[in-house]
Structure formats: structure tokens, C-alpha cells
């Protein structure tokens, strides 16, 4: 799936050593897709990452952009054991 990274997302991915394959998996086939609570243009794609202790990767992206613009990405501790 094609997407664009914001400058913030690029920085976070490098700092936290988030593998591109994990990001691709979350965007291509999320385990859970949620709307943003206050911004209808944003979606949250959540993906359990077995290669990283089954932690849940949360990718927040602007779905109105073509290709989608990834705003931020992080491992969501609040989702541990929920997916």
C-alpha cells in the first residue's frame, strides 16, 4: 500500500526503530481500524506485531489524502493484550 510519511512520523520511526515491514502490515491489513475521536479525517490502524513481543503498533493517518498521510506511529501500551 502506498502512503506518505509526515516529517514527525519519519523522525519517530527512526528514533523508535520501527521496522518498515511493521508499518506496511498495519496499513495493509490492520487488526483493528478506528476513527479518530475528534478529527473525522484521521484513522487509527492497529496491528499486533508478533516479532516485537506482540505489542500493538498504532498508525494514525489522514485518510482523505491520496496517498494516505501517516501523521504519527507508536507502540500503544494501552492496547497490550487487547488484540
Label every PLM stretch briefly:
Residues 1-83:
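Ribonuclease/tRNase effector modules and their secretory precursors
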Amino acid at each position: 500500500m502506498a502512503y506518505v510519511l509526515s516529517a514527525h512520523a519519519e523522525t519517530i520511526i527512526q528514533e523508535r526503530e520501527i521496522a518498515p515491514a511493521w508499518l506496511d502490515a498495519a496499513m495493509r491489513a490492520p487488526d483493528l481500524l478506528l476513527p479518530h475521536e475528534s478529527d473525522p479525517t484521521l484513522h487509527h490502524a492497529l496491528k499486533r506485531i508478533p516479532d516485537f513481543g506482540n505489542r500493538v503498533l498504532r498508525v494514525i493517518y489522514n485518510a482523505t489524502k491520496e496517498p494516505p498521510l501517516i501523521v504519527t506511529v507508536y507502540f500503544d501500551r494501552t492496547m497490550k493484550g487487547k488484540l
